[in-house]
Amino acid sequence: MNREDDLHPGEPVRGMVYAAMFGAATAAGAWLIIPLPPVPVTLQTFFMALAATLLGPRLGAMSQGVYVLLGIMGLPVFSGGKAGLGVLLGPTGGYLVGFVAGAWLIGLLVRTGGRPGPVRIALAVTAGYLLVYALGVSGLCLIARLSPVEAV
């Protein structure tokens, strides 16, 4: 797959198709649930990290933005088949916002410097996951009025 800065004229469409495909993969990952209260664990974060690693910061974040927008528009793509703006404003909303931010961070860290090796990719994914969980826990604390310790 080409880096965003290596795209030739006409290839932005290819990038958008990749972003849409990873948005759909993230939606599919929402249906694979490990039920833990108060927020279920799914394969969404895996697909978010994969999109960012392969597509880079801009298209990786775009893929997650597509996923979130599909859910806001009413398609049942969020965990448990949920949809609508209420999900974004609920206990899992911070995590959804975190997917976009985390994808951007992972993509940026992977693309910074030379050719990424496994260690840099692992560190980038870890940093992205930490950002997703920081935003998710913050949102959960605000919405559910929990302390950070209770939210974790």
Regions found by a protein language model. Give the residues of each.
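Short helix-perturbing small/polar motifs within transmembrane alpha-helices
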Residues: 2-6, 21-23, 28, 85-132, ...
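Interfacial helix-loop-helix junctions of multi-pass membrane proteins
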Residues: 75-81, 139-152
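Interfacial aromatic-anchored transmembrane helix boundaries in multi-pass membrane proteins
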Residues: 30-41, 66-102
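Alpha-helical transmembrane segments of multipass membrane proteins
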Residues: 27-31, 49-50, 54, 69, ...
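C-terminal TM-helix exit segments that contain a strictly Trp-centered aromatic cap at the helix terminus
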Residues: 46, 70, 131-141
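Hydrophobic transmembrane alpha-helices
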Residues: 2-61
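Juxtamembrane helix-entry segments on the extracytoplasmic side of multipass membrane proteins
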Residues: 43, 88-89, 147-152
